[in-house]
Regions:
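Sec-dependent N-terminal signal peptides
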Residues: 3-13
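A non-transmembrane, solvent-exposed segment enriched in polar/low-complexity residues
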Residues: 16-142
Length: 142
């Protein structure tokens, strides 16, 4: 419970700060060149697409402004004509606040893993998940 209160406190402090906008830069394999990337606002009852771009030179970039930190999902469609087959969609979720955020793809294993840096809200969320992981592990044993 105290972790939830801590997260709520951090989010309220961050939301009171002046927001000049965010920049989200993604670094991905160059093999994904030209693939469409969508930014989805995912913290509402109805997720919706708010921006899109294409991968160029192994990178994609979104810029915008949120009044408060928002939970978003990035969807990369490896086959733009097939947006239903899960194996042809790469996605990851993150908090975006008014900072420069970078998402770097590590595709050395079977599935791509994104390392997120630059977002204070995302860092706090990752710390929170790390703190509750032992409780989740204990719960799954019972």
């Amino acid at each position: 419970m105290k972790y939830i209160l801590f997260i709520a406190f951090i989010l309220s402090v961050v939301s009171c700060a002046k927001h000049d906008g965010y920049t989200l830069t993604g670094l991905v394999p160059e093999a994904w060149e030209g693939k469409p990337v969508f930014l989805v606002l995912d913290d509402t009852n109805q997720p919706h697409f708010i921006d899109s771009t294409k991968i160029s030179g192994g990178k994609f970039k979104f810029q915008g402004k949120f009044e408060v930190p928002r939970y978003c999902t990035i969807n990369i469609y490896l086959d733009p004509n097939d947006r239903q087959t899960r194996s042809k969609i790469i996605n990851f979720s993150l908090f975006i606040d008014s900072t420069a955020v970078e998402a770097t793809c590590n595709y050395s294993g079977k599935h791509p893993v994104f390392q997120i840096s630059g977002s204070g809200t995302q860092t706090e969320y990752q710390n929170y998940l790390s703190e509750i992981q032992p409780m989740e592990d204990d719960r799954s044993k019972t």
